[in-house]
Amino acid sequence: MSSPLSASRVALITYSGVPAITTDDRLLRDALVARGAAVDARPWDARTDWSSYHRIVLRSCWNFHHRPKEFLLWVNEVKENHDGTLRNSPELVQWSVDKRYLMDLDAGGIAIVPTIWVSAVEGDVVPNLDALIAAQGWKEGAVVKPAISATAHQTWRVAPDLASEHQARFESLLASSPSGVMVQPFLPEIRDGEWSLIFLGGEFSHAVVKRPADGDFRVQNDFGGTVERREPEPSLIEDARAVLRAAARATDTRVEDILYARVDGIVRDGALLLMELEVIEPMLFFSHAPGAAARMAELIVSR
């Protein structure tokens, strides 16, 4: 198939700590090469002549949450000097760096995990974590995480009867998190698995269920989590599609222009309860879905 941008150059964005692309993204690279593109892995935080690339596609830039200001400056630099090349779009990326984007989705009618947002304001009294959890009646305890985070970094569970033991850690996290901290109820449904529904070009592609290791709640592979391909019910796909539509409205973006998105959540009472919308650097589980990498490659070179 001849593509409009055949013989183009594509940068798959990584970071300086791990500059090579992931094993999963090699499938995307190979599919791009098969369509005539020259493909390079390039860390966002390394000197690069970005003007030489037709497409700059964010992939494993997994340190952005450690350096959010620098990352956003880089995104803005690409937007101003190489307009139209970054995927996902700068507007979508800038909006989603801070998990307070969930407020916009909540306002847009999306069912999200109940969240208490705590910000560190000089002179304010830091809330008592024990009292905060008790006031919500969260009998399973809570999960605490920074508003800017990834891969469960600085994320932990607080048992309801041990919250006072976590106060110092909570205060330390709050002091080191300019964007604030999220406190959410622990969801027992996570033991049954967290759904990840992947969309490419605004269309549903495939889904997996991630399960935590025994005794943990984090589903990431780093913590012993497992992944399996699953076919979701049509209603679950529609719930996830509604998340994309709400994100598109919030960022003045067309749904079909969202190159890739991963909608993460649990199922409660037969409906999706959103945990996160990943549009920056999600694992897309190409190895679990034959043909998905080829579909994304075609979108990259044809739009």
Report residues per predicted region.
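Conserved hydrophobic helix-helix packing surfaces used for dimerization/oligomerization
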Residues: V10-A11, T155
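Short acidic/polar capping segments at secondary-structure boundaries
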Residues: E91-L92, S119-G123, A147-T151, D161-A163, ...
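ATP-grasp fold ATP-binding core
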Residues: L105-D106, V113, I133-Q154, P178-I190, ...
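Anionic group-transfer/hydrolysis microenvironments
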Residues: C61, A147, F186-L187, I198, ...
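Phosphate-binding site of ATP-dependent enzymes
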Residues: H153, A159-A250, I266, L273
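ATP-dependent carboxylate activation and anion-phosphoryl transfer catalytic cores
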Residues: F217, P234-R303
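Short amphipathic alpha-helix with an adjacent loop that forms part of the alpha/beta core around
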Residues: D45-S52, V126-Q136, S172
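Conserved N-proximal alpha/beta basic substrate-recognition cap immediately N-terminal to
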Residues: R9, Y15-G123
